């Protein structure tokens, strides 16, 4: 749980913005959304594998684009 200390003479809006930013960096909202409903283990594995394939294809595309630019 992110904790911020409100500085002296700091407006509430600024403190709230800092708190929201720290929550975003900690990934709290995405974790809550992920745990909102039960997800079957097979679905979790399937989604993770699809993400890995997508990352791999993206990496290959970047490497291929780099090779094309060298010529």
From Swiss-Prot:
This protein's GO CC annotations: ribonucleoprotein complex; ribosome
GO biological process, any: translation
Coiled coil (residue ranges): none
Record's keyword terms, sorted: Ribonucleoprotein, Ribosomal protein
InterPro entries: Ribosomal_bS21 (IPR001911), Ribosomal_bS21_CS (IPR018278), Ribosomal_bS21_sf (IPR038380)
MF GO annotations: structural constituent of ribosome
Family: Belongs to the bacterial ribosomal protein bS21 family.
Protein name: Small ribosomal subunit protein bS21
């Amino acid at each position: 749980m992110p904790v911020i200390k409100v500085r002296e003479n700091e407006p509430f809006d600024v403190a709230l913005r800092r708190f929201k930013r720290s929550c975003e960096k900690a990934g709290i909202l995405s974790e809550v959304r992920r745990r909102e409903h039960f997800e079957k283990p097979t679905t979790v594995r399937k989604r993770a594998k699809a993400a890995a394939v997508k990352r791999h294809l993206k990496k290959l595309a970047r490497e291929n684009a780099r090779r094309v630019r060298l010529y």
